[in-house]
C-alpha cells in the first residue's frame, strides 16, 4: 500500500470502525487493528486497493458469508468500499501458529501438535462440508482466538479457496492435469505439484506436512536454492516425491506416516474419513497419557512472561509480551491473547 499508516489516522470504515494501526500484511494489502467507536470493541480490518491487479477481497467476503456460523471461522462484521479500498471488517484474532511456533523457539511438544491436529482436521472438514477446498493450508493461516476463545483455533484466508462440488447436485468438479500450482509450495500436495486439479485430499495432505513441520522444525525441501521460482518449485517437488513418508516421519509416532499414506492414497473425488484421522491422533494422545486440558506449549511460556512482567515495571510488561513475527497474511496480535 503506497500511503503511509499516518494518513489512516482518522480513517473510519463502515461508518464506525476507526483504524488504529497496521498489524499484518499480505499480497492483497494490509490488515489493521480497528476500534468500533460505538462500543470500543477491537476488530480486524482487511484493506485491498481497488486498483489491485487480482482483487480477491470481494470473493473472500462471499466465502466467509457461506462459512458463517462454523466453529473456528471468524465472524464478518462488514464488507464494502471506502475511499480507494475494498474493506473487510472481521473478528480480531490472536497469533498464527507460525507466530507461536517462533515464540516457542520453533519447538512444539507432541501434546501441542496432537491437540492442534484435532482442531485443524475439524476446521478443514467444516470447509469441505460447505463444498469448498481451502488450497492454502499452512501454519500462517491458522490463528488462535483471543479472550474467551483463546484455546480455539481459527482457519483464515479463503482467497485461494475453490468450490469442488455443486451445492444442489453434489456433482464434483472434473479431474484435470493442466493446473498451475496454487498455494504455498512448502506444504503443497504432490498432486498439486504435478498440475493435477486439487480436491479434498490435497488439503488433508498439506495438513500432514504442516504437522511434520511442527514435529521436525523444518521439512527436507525447505531452503532449496534455484535461479527462478519455477525451478525452485520443481526442486521442491522432486525432493518431496523422492522423500519416502517413512523417512519424513522417522523418529515420530507411526500415526503421522499412517496419516500421510492415507491422504496420498485417496482418490480424486473421494471424501476423506475425517473421524478416522482424528481418532488416529486421539488414540495416540491417550496412549501417551496426555490430558486434553488446552495447555499448549505457549500457555506455559505466556504464564512465565506474565509473572516476569508483573514483577517488573509497566514498561517491562510491554517487553515481555510476545509479539511474534508478523507473517504474511497473518492477522497476528498477541494483545489480549
Curated annotation (Swiss-Prot):
Its EC number is 2.7.11.1. The keyword Coiled coil does not apply. It is found in: Cytoplasm; Cytoplasm, Cytoskeleton, Microtubule organizing center, Centrosome; Chromosome, Centromere, Kinetochore; Nucleus speckle. Residues 309-325 have a biased composition (Low complexity). One of its GO terms (biological process) is negative regulation of canonical Wnt signaling pathway. Its main location: cytoplasm. Keywords: ATP-binding, Cell cycle, Cell division, Cell projection, Centromere, Chromosome, Cytoplasm, Cytoskeleton, Kinase, Kinetochore, Mitosis, Nucleotide-binding, Nucleus, Phosphoprotein, Serine/threonine-protein kinase, Transferase, Wnt signaling pathway. ATP binds at residues 23-31, 46. Autophosphorylated. It comes from the Eukaryota. It catalyses: L-seryl-[protein] + ATP = O-phospho-L-seryl-[protein] + ADP + H(+); L-threonyl-[protein] + ATP = O-phospho-L-threonyl-[protein] + ADP + H(+). GO terms for molecular function: ATP binding; protein serine kinase activity; protein serine/threonine kinase activity. It is an enzyme of class 2 (transferase). Residues 17-285 form the Protein kinase domain. PROSITE patterns: PROTEIN_KINASE_ATP, PROTEIN_KINASE_DOM, PROTEIN_KINASE_ST. GO terms for cellular component: centrosome; ciliary basal body; cytoplasm; kinetochore; nuclear speck; nucleus; spindle. The active site is at 136 (proton acceptor). Casein kinases are operationally defined by their preferential utilization of acidic proteins such as caseins as substrates. It can phosphorylate a large number of proteins. Participates in Wnt signaling. May play a role in segregating chromosomes during mitosis. May play a role in keratin cytoskeleton disassembly. Phosphorylates protein custos. PANTHER family: CASEIN KINASE-RELATED. Interacts with custos. This is Casein kinase I isoform alpha. It comes from Xenopus laevis.
Amino acid at each position: 500500500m503506497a500511503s503511509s499508516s499516518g494518513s489512516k489516522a482518522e480513517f473510519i470504515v463502515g461508518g464506525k470502525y476507526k483504524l488504529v494501526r497496521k498489524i499484518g500484511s499480505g499480497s492483497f494489502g494490509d490488515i489493521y487493528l480497528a476500534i468500533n467507536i460505538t462500543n470500543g470493541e477491537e476488530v480486524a480490518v482487511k484493506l485491498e486497493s481497488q486498483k489491485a491487479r487480482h482483487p480477491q477481497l470481494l470473493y473472500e467476503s462471499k466465502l466467509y458469508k457461506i462459512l458463517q456460523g462454523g466453529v473456528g471461522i471468524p465472524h464478518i462484521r462488514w464488507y464494502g468500499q471506502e475511499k480507494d479500498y475494498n474493506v473487510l471488517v472481521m473478528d480480531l484474532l490472536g497469533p498464527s501458529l507460525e507466530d507461536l511456533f517462533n515464540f516457542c523457539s520453533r519447538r512444539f511438544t507432541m501434546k501441542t501438535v496432537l491437540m492442534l491436529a484435532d482442531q485443524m482436521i475439524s476446521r478443514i472438514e467444516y470447509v469441505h462440508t460447505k463444498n469448498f477446498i481451502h488450497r492454502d493450508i499452512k501454519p500462517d493461516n491458522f490463528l488462535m482466538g483471543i479472550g474467551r476463545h483463546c484455546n480455539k483455533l481459527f482457519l483464515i484466508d479463503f482467497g485461494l479457496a475453490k468450490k469442488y462440488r455443486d451445492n444442489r447436485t453434489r456433482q464434483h468438479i472434473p479431474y484435470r492435469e493442466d493446473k498451475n500450482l496454487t498455494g504455498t509450495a512448502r506444504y503443497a500436495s504432490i498432486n498439486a505439484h504435478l498440475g493435477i486439479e486439487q480436491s479434498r485430499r490435497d488439503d488433508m495432505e498439506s495438513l500432514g506436512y504442516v504437522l511434520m513441520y511442527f514435529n521436525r522444525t523444518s521439512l527436507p525441501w525447505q531452503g532449496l536454492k534455484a535461479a527462478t521460482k519455477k525451478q525452485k518449485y520443481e526442486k521442491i517437488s522432486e525432493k518431496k516425491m523422492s522423500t519416502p513418508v517413512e523417512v519424513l516421519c522417522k523418529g515420530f509416532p507411526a500415526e503421522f506416516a499412517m496419516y500421510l499414506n492415507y491422504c496420498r492414497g485417496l482418490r480424486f473425488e473421494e471424501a476423506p474419513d475425517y473421524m478416522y484421522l482424528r481418532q488416529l491422533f486421539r488414540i495416540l494422545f491417550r496412549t501417551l497419557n496426555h490430558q486434553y486440558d488446552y495447555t499448549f506449549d505457549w500457555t506455559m511460556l505466556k504464564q512465565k512472561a506474565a509473572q516476569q512482567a508483573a514483577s517488573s515495571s509497566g514498561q517491562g510488561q510491554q517487553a515481555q509480551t510476545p509479539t511474534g513475527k508478523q507473517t504474511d497474511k497473518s492477522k497476528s496480535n498477541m494483545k489480549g491473547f
